[in-house]
């Protein structure tokens, strides 16, 4: 399936 990348910055 598709790859998902998520990035969170505080």
From Swiss-Prot:
It is a multi-pass membrane protein. It is found in: Cell membrane. It comes from the Eukaryota. One of its GO terms (molecular function) is G protein-coupled receptor activity. One of its GO terms (cellular component) is plasma membrane. Its main location: membrane. Keywords: Cell membrane, G-protein coupled receptor, Membrane, Receptor, Transducer, Transmembrane. The keyword Transmembrane applies. Disulfide bonds: none annotated. Belongs to the G-protein coupled receptor 1 family. This is Putative G-protein coupled receptor. It comes from Mus musculus.
């Amino acid at each position: 399936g598709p790859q998902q990348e998520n990035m969170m910055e505080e």
